[in-house]
Amino acid sequence: MVENLLLEEEQKEEKKYLLNYILIMIKLKSLSKSKQFIRILKKKKLNAKYFTIYFEKNLSSVKKDDKKILNISFVMKKKIGNAVIRNRIKRKLKSAVQKILKEKQPIDLNYTYVIFGRNNVYKDKFQLVFGEANDMFKRIKQMAK
């Protein structure tokens, strides 16, 4: 019985390690130059209740030292509250993307994304934002096929 408990604990620890390893393997990289933003904002977009996603297919898949890189930027308009509110919205959106990556859900790494958050992300619960993000990334993956 003690051996079974130890085995279960060991399996739980291994699962946690693997989830963290998967998250570490995919690095979120933000866009840095305004030319990149302008180019992507002229491409395709999808509107959702909590955000708008602009996306463009990368010309080449980016890998650095066996780490996969997801090019994604979270942007807020200055009209939305103060800096504290805008940063909280960005954190919520970023954690939703990280959770999607942890659960091996469909985020296509061959795309570059710019996500414009909306004000209602601040008020609503994380699970609603996560569900909406998951649905939008599924739609993008289906559009790619």
Q: Model-flagged regions — what are they?
A:
Residues 1-145:
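Positively charged, solvent-exposed patches that mediate nucleic-acid binding
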